[in-house]
Amino acid sequence: MTIAELFAPNQTLAGHLLALLDNQATDTAHDLAHLLRVWQNVRKISAVEGGNLTVLTAATLLHDCVHVPKDSPDRANASRLAATAAKAALTKLNRPEQEIAAVRHAIEAHSFSANLSPKTLEARILQDADRLDALGHIGIARCFAVSGALGRPLYDPLDPQADARDLDDTNFALDHFSTKLLQLAGQFQTETGRILARERHAVLMQFYEGFLNEVTLS
């Protein structure tokens, strides 16, 4: 089976879009494996909630097509830039205007940094599917992979839980759990997404509490 065939019945569209992504440099948290995990989440959610799989195929494959580093001052614009690039790519493929508009909105609204409300079912599904990948075991791995790539320490050895300092996930990987990851489960858009998120949130909490138990100085 090819990668494009994983997106059946939209494997032809997927093949065209995957070809556009072949030469794009990206970090390990937003690579092809991430796209496939998000697609798996999309399928799980849409199997219950519904949604247009053609729109979801394109939105999944293109939602990170413009890479803006996590430490960039332009990070909040990443989803808008990706949505603009997605529109251009789909226009070249002569996709219907209504489909392009739906894909563009889903991409714009998926990002935590963009802080936009998803207005369509497809946008809600993509946002949930992408955020699920920030939770659970894979979310833990992605958090530390990104922090390591940015040269950030794992935690503050004198105050790992930030009891006497401000949380700062630009300096400590563990702080990202409190500033973002542990808040995500309450922000899901679909009932199916919320169910899946609760399971992965429990994994995060178990890891976080165990980590603190091992590193907190007595």
Residues covered by each model-derived region:
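Divalent metal-dependent phosphate-bond-processing catalytic cores, especially two-metal-ion Mg2+/Mn2+ enzymes
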Residues: 2-5, 24-49, 62, 115-218
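Short alpha-helical hairpin
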Residues: 4-20
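Generic alpha-helical secondary structure signal
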Residues: 12, 16, 57-60, 102, ...
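An active-site-proximal "capping" alpha-helix that borders the catalytic cofactor pocket
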Residues: 38, 78-91
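His-Asp-centered metal-binding catalytic motifs of divalent-metal-dependent phosphohydrolases/nucleases
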Residues: 53-72, 78, 82, 103-111
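A short secondary-structure junction motif
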Residues: 69-74, 185-189
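Hydrophobic, well-structured mid-protein blocks that either form specific transmembrane helices
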Residues: 89-124
